[in-house]
Amino acid sequence: MAYRSCVVGFSSLSGCEMTPAGSPQPGTSGWGSCGLPGPGFSSRSLTSCRPAGTIPKVTVNPSLLVPLDLKVDPAVQQQKNQEKEEMKALNDKFASLIGKVQALEQRNQLLETRWSFLQGQGSATFDLSHHYETFQGRLQEELRKVSQERGQLEANLLQVLEKVEEFRVRYEDEISKRTDLEFTFVQLKKDLDAECLRRTELETKLKGLQGFLELMRTVYEQELKDLTAQVKDVSVTVGLDSRCHIDLSGIVEEVKAQYDAIAARSLEEAEAYSRSQLEERAARSAEFGNSLQSSRCEIADLNVRIQKLRSQIVSVKSHCLKLEENIKVAEEQGELAFQDAKDKMAQLENALQKAKQDMARQLREYQDLMNTKLALDIEIATYHKLMEGEESRMDLPSATVVSTVKSGCRTTASKSGLTKTSSRKKKNRRGPVIKITEMSEKYLSQESEASE
């Protein structure tokens, strides 16, 4: 049979236009005109329908309240025709309600399917925490290895620094010894120079004494010549004077012998003194020469050792530079690895946070879906009650006027029942919402504890 199009609005659902086939017309996408779900079904399409109208009021003719007149009246036939029209309207409304109930059942099935899909997706997302923990453990193991390598490098650096300190102390000791030896060498050189000067002075004195000795010899010879000449003169005089018989030759010989003895003694003393001084100076010069030679040998040995120490210091410095470069490279690599680990840790934390946010969003969507499902269940129950009331009203055999009165009363009762069911719906909405919120908070707290 053909039905008329009607507009019925309830809660957040819009009116549905019925086709002659008795099924609602689907929209182009989503829930178009509150019909069947299209291919673009989403959580937003649940609230995309706007109410197109409200349930029309059932008007009661006041003349029906007048006591019945059993006489045949033309108004009775008119009243029956009016009741037939009302029955047709109610049948159309009933057919629209049946189509809406079917659409709501399909919508409920879609919501259940989506809820199961979201639960599977949430469990899969939650299972990724094991992979995150494994990757985090591997990064921590790498960080521990890098820390151990850094500790070993620091220990090697301390050993190298100790060796460098030991070589530095030895180098300072050698420098101090070299300084002492150089000071000793300078002192010995000063003593050698002083001895050379003294030797030169002694040689000069020896030459002066030899010159003085020659001079004294010349003087003595000249005096001897003078005395000889005087003796000759005296002898001549004596020869002339025959009265004096003085023997001057003996005196001259005696004086000459005395002078010769004095000159010989002076020469011997001078030669002995000069020889002793020369021997002493030669001994001291030989001693200083030996000490100088030993000092030169020691200086040569020290120079060789200094060269060796310098080469060792250069090699140690180069080794220290290489170790410092290796330490810098190791520190840079450790810092890069640590920074990479921190970045990966931050990425994992961001991914975990994003997963938590996705889980919370899915929980909120689930909560919204459950609220929508609850509202739809309440609407379905209300429609079932309305249909049961309509069926019970249609099944009761009674007179035309009484049925009309009863239908009006039932319509009023259905309105009151609708009001009661809507109030119950508002009351019952809070219970599951609170339960879902508590469940989501409990799940988020467990997830945060597991991540910690």
Swiss-Prot record:
Additional information? There are two types of cytoskeletal and microfibrillar keratin, I (acidic) and II (neutral to basic) (40-55 and 56-70 kDa, respectively).
Q: Residues annotated as region Linker 12?
A: 228-251
Task: Give the family, as the similarity comment puts it.
Answer: Belongs to the intermediate filament family.
Please give the SUPFAM superfamilies that the UniProt record associates with this protein.
Answer: Intermediate filament protein, coiled coil region
Compositional bias annotation for Polar residues:
443-452
Q: Where is this site: Stutter?
A: G334
**Region listing for Coil 2, in residue ranges:** 252-390
Instruction: Report domain IF rod positions.
Output: 83-394
Q: Mind listing the UniProt keywords for this protein, alphabetically? A: Coiled coil, Intermediate filament, Keratin, Phosphoprotein
Region annotation Tail: where it falls in the sequence? 391-452
Identify the InterPro entries for this entry: IF_rod_dom, Keratin_2_head, Keratin_II
Give the region (Coil 1B) as residue ranges.
136-227
Q: What is the lineage of its organism?
A: Eukaryota, Metazoa, Chordata, Craniata, Vertebrata
The region called Head is annotated at: 1-82
User: What's the domain of life for this entry?
Assistant: Eukaryota
Give the gene that encodes this protein.
Krt80
Matching Pfam families: Filament (PF00038), Keratin_2_head (PF16208)
An annotated GO cellular component of this protein is: keratin filament
Q: Positions modified as Phosphoserine? A: S45
Instruction: Give the region (Coil 1A) as residue ranges.
Output: 82-118
What name does this protein carry?
A: Keratin, type II cytoskeletal 80
User: Where is the region Disordered?
Assistant: 412-452
Has UniProt tagged this entry with the keyword Coiled coil? yes
Q: Where is this region: Linker 1?
A: 119-135
Record note on quaternary structure = Heterotetramer of two type I and two type II keratins.
Ranges of Basic residues compositional bias?
422-432
Q: Which organism was this protein described from?
A: Mus musculus (Mouse)
